[in-house]
UniProtKB/Swiss-Prot annotation:
The presence of a 'disulfide through disulfide knot' structurally defines this protein as a knottin. It comes from Hybanthus floribundus (Greenviolet). This is Cyclotide Hyfl-B. This is a cyclic peptide. Probably participates in a plant defense mechanism. InterPro entries: Cyclotide (IPR005535), Cyclotide_moebius_CS (IPR012324), Cyclotide_sf (IPR036146). It comes from the Eukaryota. PROSITE patterns: CYCLOTIDE (PS51052), CYCLOTIDE_MOEBIUS (PS60009). Keywords: Disulfide bond, Knottin, Plant defense. There is a cross-link at G1-N32 (Cyclopeptide (Gly-Asn)). One of its GO terms (biological process) is defense response. Belongs to the cyclotide family. Moebius subfamily. The lineage of its organism: Eukaryota, Viridiplantae, Streptophyta, Embryophyta, Tracheophyta. Disulfide bonds join C6-C22, C10-C24, C15-C29.
Length: 32
């Protein structure tokens, strides 16, 4: 399936929830 969008957008290519498995993809933070 598709990645789940996290609760934030990216800020300068970084996600605040990266430690929870979220990564920056096309200005959105997605859980992979």
């Amino acid at each position: 399936g598709s990645p789940i969008q996290c609760a934030e957008t990216c800020f300068i290519g970084k996600c605040y929830t990266e430690e929870l498995g979220c990564t920056c993809t096309a200005f959105l933070c997605m859980k992979n």
